[in-house]
Amino acid sequence: IINSAAKVGGIYANDTQGTSFLIENLKININILESIINLPKVSLINLGSSCIYPLNAPNPINENSFMGGILEPTNSPYAMAKLTAIELGKTLKKDYGHNIINIMPTNLYGPNDNFDDLNSHVIPGLISRMHQAKLKNERDFNIWGTGKPLREFLYVDDLAEAIKFISKEKINTDLINVGSGVEISIKELAEKIKLTIGFN
């Protein structure tokens, strides 16, 4: 079983809809994980999020930073729901012998992404807003923030390959980060999108 179900959104959506993000994601994870309790030994891959790591975790973030500090406030409700799923997976393994592996992908992008201005993640959000600015012949573009934060991105098909690989291997840990290993600043990312879109 692969659990990739989640209510997701970008920083604005997480910051303004925290209650909904927490409740909906708790419901999703509890419903799925509770449903396997009385089944024969189940193998389940649970997709989490890199936002489960502390705000001040050293980069590159590794699994040893898990539960090592305060979460980033704007998406802590989403992170708490994901942390609850990890803990529930541990108890299901201990109490019922199920094999639960939690994969923490970095920031994803790819086909069928959400390009809504207020609810998208960083790459589709920048693409959408910059494209709209170009169509309106606007000279300035606000990337939101300083542009200095570093982010790691992973193409969604690469995550699919990682899931296939992990599902076939004997894994002795219940928490695995999946990423590209390459970080880029938001400003550099915006510059790449600017060149691709042709925004002057």
Predicted regions and their residues:
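Active-site helix of classical SDR
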Residues: 77, 81-84
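Conserved Rossmann-fold NAD(P)-dependent oxidoreductase catalytic core, especially the SDR/UDP-sugar
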Residues: 3, 30-75, 101
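C-terminal substrate-binding subdomain of Rossmann-fold SDR/epimerase-dehydratase oxidoreductases
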Residues: 126, 132-200
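Structural signature of the Rossmann-like NAD(P)-dependent dehydrogenase/reductase core
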Residues: 3, 43-48, 101-107, 142-145, ...
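Conserved catalytic-core motifs of eukaryotic protein kinase domains, centered on the activation segment
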Residues: 11-19, 55-60, 112-115
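Hydrophobic positions on the long internal alpha-helix
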Residues: 28, 32-36, 88-89, 162, ...
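NAD(P)H-binding glycine-rich loop region in Rossmannoid oxidoreductase-like domains
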Residues: 1-25
